[in-house]
């Protein structure tokens, strides 16, 4: 009996070691990056310094070592063989193309925000995660970094905007179609139009919060019906974030931030801010498509 127990233990230990083994050389080959293994945590991490762009923060030139290095760390998964977490250092004109590459690869985007004040050019940080086969995860990371190289190769000079600026004319947005598509009753001001849709949350104090306390999705339109800007904010559950991001990016809407507005609320919400350009009808249907990915 003791012999049987010992053999069982050895087999179990062997299986655990096998499961925990991260193939660093394979990850290096698939990502094209050099990495290192933290043996105590069983994590293999690859890094990619942004030495291709000169960034100053508060007038001081930042070396990549001080926080301008993209990274991805691989560890054994629970439900699937491997998990990955990472942070990509991006310029403004790289963010949305890289986000699409990440989402198309099956990885998740979990945050998008700044780490500095007074940085020139402005730098954004996209946090990513995923679980699956190590090959798929590593290829997804590489696709994102290759997209950065592609953009900088085609346009070494950083873009100053999404495209041509909106014509400097008075706004004349017709809100009726927006209300009809979204099922809202919006507000007009100086030719602009805004709609707000609320959700419910219970705060840490037990207080109820809804639309007027900031638990809302909104969209504001300016320009003309034929050529408009839309900017706004989506409030989403954590389980809805990836579907909403994919829907907005599929329709050409730019994501400009993903973060929290609250702490301790139930259910837990994330907020994503967006910016789009096009005919009002097209933009409205893009927003409707993303809203359809959220709970009613």
What positions do the PLM features span?
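Bacterial N-terminal signal peptides
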Residues: 5-15
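Long, contiguous binding/interaction regions
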Residues: 20-122, 129-269, 275-296
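N-terminal secretory signal peptides that target proteins for export/translocation
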Residues: 1-2
């Amino acid at each position: 009996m003791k012999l049987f127990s010992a053999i069982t233990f050895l087999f179990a230990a062997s299986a655990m070691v096998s499961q925990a083994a991260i193939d660093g050389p394979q990850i290096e080959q698939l990502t094209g990056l050099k990495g290192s293994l933290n043996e105590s945590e069983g994590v293999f991490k690859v890094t990619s310094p942004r030495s291709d762009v000169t960034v100053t923060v508060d007038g001081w030139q930042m070396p990549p070592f001080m926080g301008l290095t993209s990274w991805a760390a691989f560890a054994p998964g629970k439900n699937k063989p491997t998990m990955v977490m990472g942070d990509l250092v991006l310029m403004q004109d790289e963010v949305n193309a890289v986000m699409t590459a990440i989402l198309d690869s099956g990885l998740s985007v979990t945050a998008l925000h700044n780490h500095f004040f007074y940085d020139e050019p402005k730098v954004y940080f996209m946090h990513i995660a995923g679980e699956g086969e190590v090959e798929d995860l590593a290829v997804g990371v590489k696709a994102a970094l290759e997209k950065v190289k592609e953009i900088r190769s085609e346009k070494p000079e950083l873009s100053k905007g999404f495209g041509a600026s909106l014509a400097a004319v008075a706004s004349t947005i017709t809100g009726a179609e927006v209300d009809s598509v979204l099922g809202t009753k919006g507000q007009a001001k100086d030719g602009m139009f805004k709609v707000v849709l609320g959700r419910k949350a219970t705060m840490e104090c037990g207080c109820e919060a809804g639309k007027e306390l900031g638990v809302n999705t909104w969209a504001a339109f300016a320009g003309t019906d034929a050529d408009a800007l839309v900017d706004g904010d989506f409030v989403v559950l954590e389980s809805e974030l990836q579907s909403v991001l994919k829907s907005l990016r599929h329709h050409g809407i730019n994501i400009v931030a993903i973060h929290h507005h609250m702490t301790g609320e139930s259910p837990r919400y994330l907020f994503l801010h967006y910016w789009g350009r096009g005919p009002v009808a097209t933009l409205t249907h893009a927003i409707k498509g993303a809203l359809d990915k959220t709970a009613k």
